[in-house]
């Protein structure tokens, strides 16, 4: 009976050791993924900045991702160009207002 307990304890130790190495590998992969996401986050376009060349590159706001909003601008020579900026759409502003109001009321 003692031999069985020793063998079981040895197996449990080996399994826990091997799984901890697997977890370390997993943590290293997650760390690399987080670093890549952080790099992407740094490259996003902040609110009120121009996004004409990268319409899907706006950063995230408090609750929602900013949207690239475009307008047509008439230049001095009479031509028209499209200018875009990252901003919060009206329905997102309304949702943020409701959530902020709810937080003030309900704490």
Swiss-Prot record:
Q: What is its main location?
A: secreted
Keywords in alphabetical order: Disulfide bond, Knottin, Secreted, Signal, Toxin
Q: Which residues are processed away as propeptide to yield the mature protein?
A: 21-41
This protein's GO cellular component annotations are: extracellular region
Kindly indicate where the leader peptide sits in this chain: 1-20
Disulfide bond sites? 44-59, 51-68, 58-86, 70-84
Question: Where is the protein localized?
Answer: Secreted
What does the entry state regarding organ or tissue expression? Expressed by the venom gland.
- Quote the record's domain comment: The presence of a 'disulfide through disulfide knot' structurally defines this protein as a knottin.
Q: What is this protein called?
A: U1-lycotoxin-Ls1w
């Amino acid at each position: 009976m003692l031999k069985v307990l020793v063998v079981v304890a040895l197996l449990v130790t080996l399994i826990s050791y091997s799984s901890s190495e697997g977890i370390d590998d997993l943590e290293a992969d997650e760390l690399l993924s987080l670093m890549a996401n952080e790099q992407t986050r740094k490259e996003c376009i902040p609110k009120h900045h121009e996004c004409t060349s990268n319409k899907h590159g706006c950063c995230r706001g408090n609750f929602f991702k900013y949207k690239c909003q475009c307008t047509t601008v008439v230049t001095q020579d009479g031509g028209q160009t499209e200018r875009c900026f990252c901003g919060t759409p009206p329905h997102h502003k309304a949702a943020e207002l409701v959530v902020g109001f709810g937080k003030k009321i309900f704490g």
